[in-house]
Structure formats: structure tokens, C-alpha cells
Amino acid sequence: MSTTDNTNGDDRRPGQPEWDDEENNFEHLDATEVPAEEEALVESAGLDADTLADLEDAFDGVDASTEDPGATVGETSTLESELAERTEDLQRLSAEYANYRRRTDRERKVGVEAAKAKVLGELLPILDDLELAQKHGDLDEGPLKAFRDKLVSVVEGLGVSAFGAEGDVFDAERHEAVQDLSSGDDKVLGTVLRRGYQMNDRLLRTAMVIIADPAEDAQ
């Protein structure tokens, strides 16, 4: 029996599909061609070696977490615990800062009031002299009266008020008695030698007085 000659010079058997030759050709490709193509793709994408290494590490981490779900759950629990601790620390610091602000504001106000009281205390002798001049009729008119009125207006605007008038009930905390002419338990101010002053609720100076009996008792 005669055989059919292969006029194309290849080794295909009759009826064998042509794509078998393509597979054989792939087997004979140079192994260095594939990496060269990959390198060309990397260069065209603008990636360097460090970026590729970071991407590989990221993919490795994803693969590891996928392979071990328990590790991911543990890490999440740890992060939640750390977040709770940091939240508590932040709340504590916030409360401490609020207390610090309140304390410093309070101390600042006390310092301001003390400074005002010191300055006003030095003005009180001037007010005493002006009041004495007014009793003698020297402030009925003229520039001295205008000065007195302006000074009184300023100190009153700062919350300063005078106290101590004849007939007021004696108060040992606010009145300094230089003489006691009373005969009973009820004591009032008989003579006011020097009025006292206070700034709001702060005592600037006590009033200097002579104690006497109430008017009805004296009769």
C-alpha cells in the first residue's frame, strides 16, 4: 500500500489540526521573552521597583488575611480596644482642660478684683477730703465740685459704694468703734467719723464710728 507524500515538509499526520504546530512552537519559545514583555509593561505603566515591591507586599498581606480569618478578627479586636483606650484618654484630658480653664478664669477674676481694690483703696483718702470739704460748704460750686462729682461717678461705676450713717445698726465686721457710749445691748452708730466703702461684696474699708443707744432708748 502506498502512502501520501507530505508536500509541505512537516511531520503532521493526516487529519491532524494545524493548531498542534502552534503548541509545539510555544514549547520552543525562549524563556527570556516573557520577562522582557513584563518589563516593557511595567515601564509603560510608570512603575519603579519600590512601587512593585510595595504592591507585592500588599497582595501578600491580603492573601495572608484571607488564608487566616482568625488573625483578622484578632487584629480588629485589638484595634477596637486601643480605640476605646484612646477615647477614654481624650475624654479625661478634655475634662482636665475644662477644669483648668475654669480654675484659671476664677483666679484671673480674683486677681483683677484685688488690683482694682488696691487702686480704689488709695483713692479713698481723696474722697474723705472731698466729703469734708462738702460739709464745710466748699463744694457748692466751682471746679472743685466738678472734680468731686466726676471722681465719685468713676468709683461708683466700678461698683464702689459708701456705707455708715448715723442711726445704722452697729456691725462689728463693717464698723470700727473708737468709742462706745451705749448703755444697753442695742447699739447704733451715734457719730460717723469716717465712712466705710465696699466694692460690690468686697470690703474696702471699715467705717470709723462712735456707738450710741438707739434714739428711742436715749429718750
Curated annotation (Swiss-Prot):
* Entry GO CC: cytoplasm
| CDD domains assigned | GrpE (cd00446)
Please name the Gene3D superfamilies in this protein's record. 3.90.20.20, Head domain of nucleotide exchange factor GrpE
| Major place of residence | cytoplasm
Q: Which domain of life is it from?
A: Bacteria
**Listed SUPFAM superfamilies:** Coiled-coil domain of nucleotide exchange factor GrpE, Head domain of nucleotide exchange factor GrpE
* Biological process terms in GO annotation: protein folding
The protein's GO terms of the molecular function aspect are:
adenyl-nucleotide exchange factor activity; protein homodimerization activity; protein-folding chaperone binding; unfolded protein binding
Stretches the record annotates as Disordered: 1-32, 59-87
Q: Which UniProt keywords apply?
A: Chaperone, Cytoplasm, Stress response
The protein's location, in the record's own words, is: Cytoplasm
| Assembly and interaction partners | Homodimer.
The function of this protein is: Participates actively in the response to hyperosmotic and heat shock by preventing the aggregation of stress-denatured proteins, in association with DnaK and GrpE. It is the nucleotide exchange factor for DnaK and may function as a thermosensor. Unfolded proteins bind initially to DnaJ; upon interaction with the DnaJ-bound protein, DnaK hydrolyzes its bound ATP, resulting in the formation of a stable complex. GrpE releases ADP from DnaK; ATP binding to DnaK triggers the release of the substrate protein, thus completing the reaction cycle.
Which family is this sequence assigned to?
A: Belongs to the GrpE family.
Q: Tell me the protein's name.
A: Protein GrpE
Cite the source lineage: Bacteria, Bacillati, Actinomycetota, Actinomycetes, Mycobacteriales
